[in-house]
């Protein structure tokens, strides 16, 4: 056209393509967020974690770019961009500090899961089991079904005997470790079926790495970030 304007049909076509692209992106994002749980799909969970980890540096880079673009042009935008960059950087640093502190207690890479700040740990058949939880619960239940052990609904081991159920479990947070002692159980040794219930007994600066005994040894009591 002579006046240099963009034809309406071309604008509609670009909007249609743009809308279709965003429809695909948002649908994929919706599926990842809804079903990106470790119990449902390890692959979707990995994609979800990658998205969460990428968001911090991406938002920080966008905030710094906005600050550079707004410098001496729009001081209000510049101030807000600097503020958002500082908030993002602070959240990023806090995430790494708390994750490292949690890792020192559990020695598990679940410590770097950005979805939670608490890990339930116990020892089963000499193997350390670590499960992310949303918070420190009032009580913890271990369920044994025909020799298959479930911890808070997670399948963690098979071929487990009733006598191998631990005497305590721990829930580690960045600032403390909560020890749960066994207060009751109902088991059928012949079928390898039953349950054990644990409640809070104490908390402190303990290592969350546990053993099947009822007493925390001196080697399990370690100081962390102070």
UniProtKB/Swiss-Prot annotation:
Q: Which GO terms describe its cellular component?
A: host cell Golgi membrane; membrane; viral envelope; virion membrane
Q: Where is this region: Interaction with N protein?
A: 200-216
Please give the function described in this protein's UniProt entry.
Answer: Component of the viral envelope that plays a central role in virus morphogenesis and assembly via its interactions with other viral proteins.
Q: What is this protein called?
A: Membrane protein
- Entry superkingdom: Viruses
Q: Which InterPro entries match?
A: ALPHA_CORONA_M, M_CoV
GO molecular function terms noted in the UniProt entry: structural constituent of virion
Residues annotated as transmembrane: 12-32, 42-62, 76-96
Q: Classify the main location.
A: virion
Topology of the protein relative to the lipid bilayer: Multi-pass membrane protein
Family affiliation = Belongs to the alphacoronaviruses M protein family.
> On the Virion surface side, which residues?
1-11, 63-75
Where in or outside the cell is it found? Answer: Virion membrane; Host Golgi apparatus membrane
**Which UniProt keywords are given for this protein, alphabetically ordered?**
Glycoprotein, Host Golgi apparatus, Host membrane, Membrane, Transmembrane, Transmembrane helix, Viral envelope protein, Viral matrix protein, Virion
The residues exposed to the Intravirion compartment are 33-41, 97-226
Report which residue ranges the record marks as coiled coil. Answer: none
Q: How does it assemble?
A: Homomultimer. Interacts with envelope E protein in the budding compartment of the host cell, which is located between endoplasmic reticulum and the Golgi complex. Forms a complex with HE and S proteins. Interacts with nucleocapsid N protein. This interaction probably participates in RNA packaging into the virus.
């Amino acid at each position: 056209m002579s006046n240099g304007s963009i034809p309406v049909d071309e604008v509609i076509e670009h909007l249609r393509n743009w809308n279709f692209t965003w429809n695909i992106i948002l649908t994929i994002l919706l599926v990842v967020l809804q079903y990106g749980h470790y119990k449902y799909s390890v692959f979707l969970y990995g994609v979800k974690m990658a998205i969460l980890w990428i968001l911090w540096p991406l938002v920080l880079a966008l905030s710094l770019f906005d600050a550079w673009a707004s410098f001496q042009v729009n001081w209000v935008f510049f101030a807000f961009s600097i503020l958002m960059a500082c908030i993002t950087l602070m959240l990023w640093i806090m995430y790494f500090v708390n994750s490292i502190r949690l890792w020192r207690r559990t020695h598990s890479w679940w410590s770097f899961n950005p979805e939670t700040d608490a890990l339930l740990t116990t020892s089963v058949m000499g193997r350390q089991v670590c499960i992310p939880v949303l918070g420190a619960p009032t009580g913890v239940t271990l369920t044994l079904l025909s020799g298959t052990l479930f911890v808070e609904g997670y399948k963690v081991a098979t071929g487990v005997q009733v006598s191998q159920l631990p005497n305590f479990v721990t829930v580690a947070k960045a600032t403390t470790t909560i020890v749960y002692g066994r207060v009751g159980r109902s088991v059928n040794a012949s079928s390898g079926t039953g349950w054990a219930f644990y409640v809070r007994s104490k908390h402190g600066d303990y290592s969350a790495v546990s053993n099947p005994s009822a007493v925390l040894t001196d080697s399990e009591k370690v100081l962390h970030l102070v």
